[in-house]
């Protein structure tokens, strides 16, 4: 039997009512890729390019010059005839540094964009925690993903109607859109382990899953011990399935397991497809900006196009992704399922506490999350800082900034598809590939710091003194992002106890997005203090370097072994749910 071109070797035994154990098919994978194609444009084109400079420009049009704090900033986008003014001849005032007053506080217009991002990340972290219970249990995972996509894309489109007089409203729409994007990507990431777990190539493995063929007599009782002890899902189905020896036997001694290979491939394709879509839309946005004479309206118009793209291409994902329901969430006192959202939210916060406590037994997850906390903060902060630096201190126009992003994305596509080849040829473990990306990433802030060296400063170029220097740095940033985006996500998935994907991916996302509260805010503070962005490169260089020793300590084999053992222990404690699921299984 075949479905959408992929052979269906059999069906896994359901663990609870509504459990979707069908093998992953081509249409489901296309649905997963489709949302990356839809939403990655906001990450790359909006957050990575046009949204920060739109917020800065709208605030600038309502601000005053930092030099005298009375002269209004220009009301239109003005760039000198020659944008090649070297940094050493440009004071912050000459570079057009502007400030606005928000709640009586003096805020640099570049800092306004950074603070807006920090606030959105804080709200995003709270939202991600609150929804994780509904993502793990019941059939809400897909519904929430589509809902957040709709809200986020509409808010992005509404920025078109925002004028500089109400620039704070633009910041509000940006906060909502970025919050929804982050929440939707958490839900999308939680599908990845399920797509891998039910992938036909894994189901065909001799030592893999025991399956029930659809042609067999489904009326025969199937005991819960029909699963092999080598099955990574066995701990979810029986309380006394795996011993530590079993888990050690299950884990291959090779550098990369079959599951990690499939997970990395799917993740890399998803990132690559998303970047391809972003490159295409970015090209359209640049043409629109040039044709509309690079005004503030031009920036708002391209943000509308980004939101429209996000909305339209979410539709295939809404149709093709399977809900893949989780087990029902039962109340401890009566064993009945939760019916209200308040119940799900309360459970989610309690679950976060339990998940955080569980990580005490998972040394490698702790090490990875600590490293990822710092690394993801650096990734998010470098992107926004570079764009605002190029606009406010190198006086680059929107079209030029858009071209940098195109180069970055092309490099990202190349990186997403090539890092797996490089790691395979060099026989690198996933953690080693991530470390190589970190070393390459460190070059970006170090290059910016060259501008402080007097000998280089006197040259008038190098050390980010000329606009053209942003382009090669964009290539490096793209290569790094292509590798980190795919490898970190899939590598973390291998360290998660089976059956707890959404909870641990919520922790992953909170670590990722939550850390980004600090980096942009610190850069904003540095910018407010010094009147320019360049000193923030010292902070970024340290921030990117700190994850290295932590990542070096991560042991993938030990992490996977500990995760499987913990899953067994956790399932053994869930006696009520085990009885309910066991009764259901015996009725099959």
UniProtKB/Swiss-Prot annotation:
Coiled-coil features, chain-numbered ranges: none
Superkingdom assignment: Eukaryota
Keywords for this protein: Amino-acid transport, Autophagy, Glycoprotein, Membrane, Transmembrane, Transmembrane helix, Transport, Vacuole
Glycan-modified residues: 84, 255
Residues in the signal sequence: none
A GO term from the CC aspect: vacuolar membrane
Location(s), subcellular: Vacuole membrane
The protein, known as: Autophagy-related protein 22-1
Gene: atg22-1
């Amino acid at each position: 039997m075949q479905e959408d071109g992929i052979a269906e070797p059999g069906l896994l035994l359901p663990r609870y009512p509504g459990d979707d154990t069908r093998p992953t098919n081509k249409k489901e994978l296309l649905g997963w890729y489709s949302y990356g194609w839809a939403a990655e444009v906001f990450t790359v084109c909006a957050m990575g390019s046009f949204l920060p400079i739109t917020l800065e420009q709208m605030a600038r049009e309502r601000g005053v010059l930092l030099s005298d704090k009375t002269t209004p900033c220009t009301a239109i986008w003005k760039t000198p005839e020659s944008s090649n003014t070297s940094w050493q001849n440009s004071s912050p005032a000459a570079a057009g540094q502007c400030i606005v007053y928000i709640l009586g506080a003096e805020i640099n217009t570049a800092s306004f964009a950074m603070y807006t991002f920090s606030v959105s990340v804080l709200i995003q972290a709270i939202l991600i925690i609150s929804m994780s219970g509904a993502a793990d249990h019941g059939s809400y995972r897909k519904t929430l993903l589509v809902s957040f996509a709709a809200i986020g894309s509409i808010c992005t489109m509404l920025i078109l109607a925002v004028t500089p007089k109400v620039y704070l409203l633009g910041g509000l729409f940006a906060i909502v859109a970025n919050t929804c994007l982050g929440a939707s990507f958490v839900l999308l990431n939680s599908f990845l382990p399920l797509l891998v777990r039910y992938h036909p190539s894994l189901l065909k493995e001799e030592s893999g899953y025991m399956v029930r063929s659809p042609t067999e007599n489904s009326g025969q009782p199937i005991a819960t011990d029909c699963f092999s002890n080598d099955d990574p899902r066995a701990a979810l189905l029986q309380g006394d399935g795996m011993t530590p020896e079993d888990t050690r036997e299950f884990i291959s001694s090779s550098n990369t397991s079959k599951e990690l290979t499939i997970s990395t491939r799917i993740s890399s394709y998803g990132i690559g497809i998303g970047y391809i879509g972003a490159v295409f839309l970015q090209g359209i946005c640049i043409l629109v900006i040039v044709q509309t004479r690079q005004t503030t309206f031009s920036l708002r118009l391209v943000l509308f196009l980004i939101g429209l793209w996000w909305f339209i291409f979410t539709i295939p994902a809404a149709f093709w992704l399977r809900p893949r329901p989780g087990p029902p969430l039962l109340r401890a006192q009566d064993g009945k399922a939760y019916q209200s959202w308040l119940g799900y939210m309360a459970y989610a916060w309690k679950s976060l506490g339990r998940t955080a406590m569980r990580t005490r037994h998972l040394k490698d997850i702790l090490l990875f999350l600590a490293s990822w906390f710092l690394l993801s903060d650096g990734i998010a902060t470098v992107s926004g800082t570079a764009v605002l630096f190029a606009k406010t201190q190198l006086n680059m126009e929107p079209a030029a900034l858009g071209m940098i992003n195109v180069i970055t994305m092309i490099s990202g596509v190349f990186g997403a598809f090539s890092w797996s080849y490089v790691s395979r040829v060099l026989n690198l473990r996933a953690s080693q590939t991530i470390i190589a990306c970190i070393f390459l990433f460190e070059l970006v802030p170090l290059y910016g710091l060259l501008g402080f060296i007097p000998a280089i400063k006197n040259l008038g170029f190098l050390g980010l003194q000329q606009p053209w220097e942003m382009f090669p740095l964009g290539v490096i940033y793209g290569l790094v992002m292509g590798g980190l985006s795919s490898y970190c996500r899939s590598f973390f998935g291998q360290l998660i106890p089976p059956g707890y994907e959404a909870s641990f991916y919520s922790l992953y996302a909170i670590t990722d997005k939550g850390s980004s509260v600090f980096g942009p805010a610190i850069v904003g503070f540095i910018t407010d203090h010094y009147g320019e962005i360049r000193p923030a490169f010292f902070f970024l260089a340290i921030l990117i370097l700190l994850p290295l020793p932590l990542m070096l300590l991560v042991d993938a084999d030990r992490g996977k072994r500990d995760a499987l053992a913990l899953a067994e222990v956790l399932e053994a404690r869930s006696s009520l749910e085990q009885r309910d699921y066991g009764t259901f299984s015996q009725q099959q």
